[in-house]
Amino acid sequence: MTEKFGIRTLEWSGKTGLLVNGKETLLRGGCIHHDNGVLGACSFADAEERRVRILKSQGFNALRMAHNPASRSLLDACDRIGMYVMDEAFDGWYIPKEYHDYSRDFLSDYKSVLTAMVENDYNHPSVIMYSLGNEVTETAAKRGIELCAEMRDTVHSLDGTRPVTCGINVLLDVYARLGIGVYSDKKEYKREPLPEGKGYKEKKSGSAFFNYWAEKLGKLFFVLSDTRLAEKAVRDISPALDIVGLNYASSRYDKDAEKYPDRLMIGTETMSADLPYNWNRVLRHKQLIGDFVWSAWDYIGETCMGWTYQSYKGLPLLSGQGMIDITGLPLAQMAFLRTVWGTETEPFLAVRPLNHSGETPSKGAWQFTNALDSWTWHGFEGKPTVAEVYTTADSVRLELNDKVIGTKKVRQNKALFSVKYAPGTLAAIALDRSENETGRTRLISGEKAPILTVRPDRSVLPPDGQALCFVEIEFTDKNGVLLPYMEQRVDIKIDGNAVTLQGFGSALTKTDEVFIHPYHNTYRGRALAVFRAGKADGKSTVTVSSENTEPVSFSIEVTGRKEE
């Protein structure tokens, strides 16, 4: 048996922060679920490799597994590519969040689960931290705090080289102490389906309870995490952890850093809109070692947490608020993160979709924009939209076809402009305090005639039954400029048995379409198809077609012969 491993050192303290190989390291983190979009819940090595590479290219240097231990394929990819990992054991402890959830077996199984996670992670240098759970209200009670300390000690007995944290939702803990938002069973639990038509529970609890009230309260819950009750909740659980993980409680950072100089903190779950405030505190306080935004990559479930339009009539399918959508496309919010982190040096320019001009979206709390970096909206001339510029500059000037639309001060790394669509060039010019140009970016309208553009990420696969070919499918003009208003059916035909279609879909949040059919509508001009190698040598020809465009064909070869 051959086992790969890595060697590196970890140190952590309130005075030094987190040190990796003796160097202070700030975690530019994102939370990810285990699913792989159009592939569903399956973990393929090629899918994890692609996902981690895209995340790394966008500036992330750390991932939090939400909310279960990572697959070996994902950890292998993180080891190779260089991505830190906070591996998380549980989404809940012994208090149910749903009727038929793991809480029913937690007390009998948690030690074996922790042991399995640590033994799986031990030789993976990418894993730098363990998390015991997510938004578990047990941490508000004495029994839960004692259990947390016991689990921490269990992990330390298996691996004393990595710190232990837990994602504490302070506001949920405050409510739990008041008996609010906690799941309760009035009858004995039965391991059988409830009668047809009967709900498992009538009231939201746990994370679902928090998500509901986060939408209602908005910025108010930021304030509620900084009360005396909240202070007590954090104070009591802190000794049971090496690093205190705080979910949506950045209002505590300044006071806790001053009052508890030896207490390490990490933003285990935050909103992207809050990053200017949060990252400023990460840079200011040694004890605050990083920030993990929700979520780095979009996922199936917890539907419609972003911006959605009523004109899409399908069933809710995706969360719809990820910094990167399920096809692997980085969105405007991702550019905002790069700007705040300082990894993006030029201003970023995006506009809200003109094919929905006049519609009012339902705005989820976890997404602050649905803008995209395109100025190609044929058929929507004269329609109003909002242009958004993300930058570290003092102010921004917006120009359309060399005419000044306006100049605005930058607030929280953003400047917004009202503008009406006209084909041509939309430009954002970043200015310093003396109004000297420090950078610029522009969006140029594409031509009207659509073509299908198909981009396979590889043309040769090994015959292992696991290798994947990812194919981006877009409606563009002849120069490759995306036509984001093109939302129509695309069909896929495969000739030859070398590969099969493993998944095909778009990033549309609400849809009645599924990922297993050889046809799907594009969303924002785009879809993703994934082909899986068989176990025998051969070649397949794939043809992609759509109405009013020329079909496009390409080949995928499956062979055991290595490419030269």
Question: How would you label these PLM feature ranges?
Answer:
Residues 416-421, 517-535:
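Short, hydrophobic beta-strand segments
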Residues 2-5, 435-447, 550-559:
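Edge beta-strands of extracellular beta-sandwich domains
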Residues 128-130, 153-157, 164-466, 478-482:
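Substrate-binding clefts and catalytic carboxylate motifs of secreted carbohydrate-active enzymes
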Residues 465-471, 538:
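Short, solvent-exposed loop/turn segments enriched in Ser/Thr/Gly
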Residues 11, 451-453, 493-510, 562-564:
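Short aromatic-acidic-glycine turn motif
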Residues 1-150, 160, 164-165, 240:
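Active-site-adjacent substrate/metal-binding segments within catalytic domains
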Residues 397-399, 489-493:
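Beta-strand signatures of extracellular beta-sandwich domains
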